[in-house]
Amino acid sequence: MDDRLSSQLERYASQVTASATLIIRHLKSLKDEPSTLPSQTSVPTAVGTAQLRLAEAAFQLLHFTRDPGNVLTQLTVDLQVISAVRWLLHFEIFSLVPLEGSISYHELSSVANVPENLLRSHIRLAMTCHLFQESGPIGMVAHSPVSCQLASDPSLVSWGQYFANSVFPTATKNVNATAAWPGSKALNETAHNLAFNHHGSFFDYVSQDPARTVEFANSMKAVSTTSLFDTCHLCKSFDWSSLGDGVVVDMGGSTGHVSIALAESFPSLRFVVQDLPDVVSNSIRQLEERQLPLSVTTRIQFQGHSLLHMQPVKGAAVYLLRQILHDWPDREAVQILRSIVPALGPRSKIFIADIVLPEAGSIPATEEQVMRCNDLLLHQFTNTLERTLEDWQAIVSRVSDNLRIQHVYRDPGSILSLLVIETV
């Protein structure tokens, strides 16, 4: 491939044109054209692929326009955007701006009890990221299509609060944690420990407060609705219908959002969602509030269970660990998997749905960047890192000589891969 700058610019520009043309054609075919692009997972495959290619080509073109000085300028901008969004979340601006119509900066500042000039500065920076818009007479602010979605979806609100209240403060202690505990793998020697001045693991910290437990569970549910983490990728990564009416044990399944998605797509499967008792109590209530069809809810049950204890459900078709093991160091990950082994039936499988780190530059940068971001985020919270395929194979080999990773698949547009483990 020709790596000259002119050739790369030409290649990515052509990709932008081709992808945008296909997406535009799809939008014009719709009865009601949306104000924002639909999720990549909710459109025809060809359109979804075009959205992925458009994002990657635009990302690369943008970076070609930046010299080193502009790179530093953009990093400064990114930091201030994050700070502004955190400020807006903290003072509940997203919920105070009406979903329909507009409100004056003066009235909004009064209701939020913040200085009007600061409010205007924070909102106008957010506007450059398509959050909020000025509408009607001068001095009036309204939701943009994007900020309206963020404000009206409770799970996204929870995710935003979790980002503002937990992720951001933790990231600021990244350097301090490495300086204090270089090379440490202890669960209680992390940036999160420094940010919140506690001495247990992150999960100890969360479990000590029911409100934290609910906020974390809801934020994980929200993450699963984004296209990169959408549960539909899991639905397409294996022939679930081949399991018939088998039982899927959704370990650490939180609100049961993954099991619900699978139950809606595969009407014969049955599910046991396991998590800590406090999480289970809240999840049962949430499931009832959703008023899903009985054909779905009657196939899902919840069970209080700790990952580190022996698996009580015997002979299930699948033991699913989706975004679970990456939170644990190798020793505990091995222990969690070993707790499943005595429960395995002759045809049981263990599914790990997690990031498998690629070789640098081997996948689209827009996808790799999210993986690398999660890699560091994990370290800041739990002192773990995302794993390569070789890392996963090493863990499985420590669990049992009779277990093998038989299949690895990453659905296009997904950040997570599915690793299928079977007894040999």
From Swiss-Prot:
It comes from Aspergillus niger (strain ATCC 1015 / CBS 113.46 / FGSC A1144 / LSHB Ac4 / NCTC 3858a / NRRL 328 / USDA 3528.7). Belongs to the class I-like SAM-binding methyltransferase superfamily. Cation-independent O-methyltransferase family. GO terms for molecular function: O-methyltransferase activity. This is O-methyltransferase aunD. Disruption phenotype: Leads to the accumulatio of aurasperone B and fonsecin B. InterPro entries: COMT-like, O_MeTrfase_dom, SAM-dependent_MTases_sf, WH_DNA-bd_sf. The active site is at H326. Disulfide bonds: none annotated. Keywords: Methyltransferase, S-adenosyl-L-methionine, Transferase. Pathway: Secondary metabolite biosynthesis. S-adenosyl-L-methionine binds at D275.
